[in-house]
Amino acid sequence: KYYFPTGGLPSQRDIMTQRAVFTEAYAVIPKGSMRDIVTSFLPNWDNTRAWVLARPLSGFAETFSQYIMEVSAGGGSTKPDTDPNAQSVLFITDGQGNLKINGVKHPLCAGSYVYIPVGAHWEIKTDATTLRFHWLRKTYVSVDGIETPDAFVTHEDKNAIDLMPDTNGAWGTTRFVDPDDIRHDMHVNIVTFQPGGVIPFEETHVMEHGLYVLQGKAVYKLNQDWVEVEAGDFIWLRAFCPQACYAGGSEPFRYLLYKDVNRHMPLKL
């Protein structure tokens, strides 16, 4: 249901050519590129490694970072983030763990979704199992008169899919934040296409995207290119990169999607 990198190292007999590409408008990091030797360790984390999928890059996607975290038994952190201006979303893909936000305990399992606002103190630990999750971070853009969002923990199964109109159920989005809640300046959703479902136009918009394929496969139109993607692949899109897709195969095509929302455009570079 939720694909996660397996690491390892390909055989010396395998060919090196895969589907990895970095362009002026988008990047694709296929699952075969997420090996042991490209992981990083992070300050104040024990028994943990991370695949860094995205970070702010000038002239590309500039608003967020995205990690895939693997916390081995007994690992975790009591000081997970070194940036006091960061807000976070965690999406658990495998294992079990324990989370504290401002002293309140929350059990975690596959499908758990966590929003951690700027200024919150949080800790995360795992005991006997390996905990795997996505960690998305963004500097919170505060606005006078608008309160900071509250922390919350939920689960995918507790949130209904909002189906797009006139798609006969082929395209829907699981939203964990009310789209009308202007306090939030980022959304992290799960988008689901049934086989044969499509984005029937080239989306071309200001929102940046981090798109991690959780399940299934599709053919994506990215800028001027058609790219085939499958579970475990990551697509990274800068603002205004045209995008559309056809979902294929025999199972739903599902991905975790980041986008920046609900704020004026900065007028200074």
Feature names for model-found ranges:
Residues N85-N98, N102, V206-N223:
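Glycine- and acidic-residue-biased ligand/ion/polar-headgroup-sensing regions
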Residues T154-G210, L214-Y220, V227:
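Surface-exposed interaction/gating patches
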Residues G103-V118, N223-A239:
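Short acidic-glycine-tyrosine-enriched beta hairpin
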